[in-house]
From Swiss-Prot:
Described function: Secreted growth factor that mediates its signal through cell-surface proteoglycan and non-proteoglycan receptors. Binds cell-surface proteoglycan receptor via their chondroitin sulfate (CS) groups. Thereby regulates many processes like cell proliferation, cell survival, cell growth, cell differentiation and cell migration. Has antibacterial activity against both Gram-positive and Gram-negative bacteria.
Matching Pfam families: PTN_MK_C (PF01091), PTN_MK_N (PF05196)
Annotated spans, Chondroitin sulfate A binding: 141-161
KW Signal (keyword) present: yes
Record's protein name: Pleiotrophin-A
Annotated GO MF terms: chondroitin sulfate binding; growth factor activity; heparin binding
Region (Chondroitin sulfate binding): 86-93, 117-125
């Protein structure tokens, strides 16, 4: 009885082994066929992020791709435009800026340049950009200190009177 039970178990294990080997081979063929279909699809090309309201914050972008066997050729995706980015260079482009330069007395402007730090979703961005802004009022700390001294002097005079 034990001998028959052992043979039965051995036959069962051999049968399971054969089924497992055949099952993995057919599964590999199906997976390879699926990979071929996926490679027929082109890369996703994304539009710029369009804010839902205003010029920054949450929004959407549209993606398209080509391919005869692609099930999906257009899709929409949520996106976000940070509100602190310089949008004049494109909301998809992030720059690292230098310090502001000295004021140009001829133009009344000061400038600084920025180099491209990051481009989101394969956006086309300029490598370097330049910003200009009007020079602010030049404060003279010595004048402010002298005004304080005058006030202190007047206060002392009032106390003496």
């Amino acid at each position: 009885m034990r001998h028959q039970h052992g043979l039965f178990m051995l036959a069962l294990l051999a049968f399971l082994f054969v089924i497992t080997v055949l099952g993995t081979d057919s599964g590999k063929k199906e997976k390879q066929e699926k990979k071929v279909k996926k490679s027929d699809c082109g890369e996703w090309q994304w539009s710029v992020c369009v804010p839902t309201s205003g010029d920054c914050g949450l929004g959407t972008r549209e993606g398209t791709r080509s391919g005869k066997e692609c099930k999906q050729t257009i899709k929409t995706q949520k996106c976000k435009i940070p509100c602190n980015w310089k949008k004049q260079f494109g909301a998809e482009c992030k720059y690292q800026f230098q310090e502001w330069g000295d004021c140009d007395p001829d133009t009344g402007l000061k400038t600084r340049s920025g180099s491209l730090k990051r481009a989101l979703h394969n956006a086309e961005c300029q490598k370097t950009v330049t910003l200009s802004k009007p020079c602010g009022k030049v404060t003279k700390p010595k004048l402010q200190e002298s005004k304080k001294k005058k006030k202190e002097g007047k206060n002392k005079e009032k106390l003496l009177d």
